[in-house]
Amino acid sequence: LRSAPVIVGSTLFYSATDSGRVFALDINSGCAKWVYTADSRLRSSIAYSEADESPVLVFSDSVGMIHTIDAKSGARIWIASGQASDNQGMLTGTPVVTGDKVIVPVSGSGVITGGNPNYECCENHGAVTALNLRTGERLWEYHTMPAAEYTGQVSSTGVKQRGPSGAPIWTTPTVDEKRGQVYVTTGENTSHP
């Protein structure tokens, strides 16, 4: 299990990540009110928001997409890429809804592929993207470090190395709405400094 449920009124919303489904369950009877099925496995917990007095659920999947669905019916509102423009990370933390924006944490995939002796380690890094809550349109993105370049070093197997890389964002961002700032914590360095 990767996700935590959200309870609103008498409904428990749960992201069954490996099955690619979101369930709306009645907390008194345990019966399903509706089930949403995505085209891929899901990765995050669910963020709940009452945008324009219409309750929505926001979450990510295993291929880097953000889903926004109607919390009352489970109907899809939109799906859009949560990836940064370099499209090299993956989404592991839960998106955050603040005002009319969805803030998306982007981690790195170099941690997974770094064990391959033929991989040109490492070229990706963490990022944060912001999407419009109503449309899914990309509003802005922030990268935790500059794009990696070849360092002139080679691995023990003769493969070119890149850097800097790393600083993935594995967790959920925190938003200071009063100051209009997003705070994230970053993970490990994945290449030589």
Located regions from the model:
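Short beta-strand segments at enzyme active-site cores
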Residues: 24, 140-142, 183-184
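A generic secondary-structure signal for well-formed alpha-helical elements
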Residues: 73, 106, 132-135, 146, ...
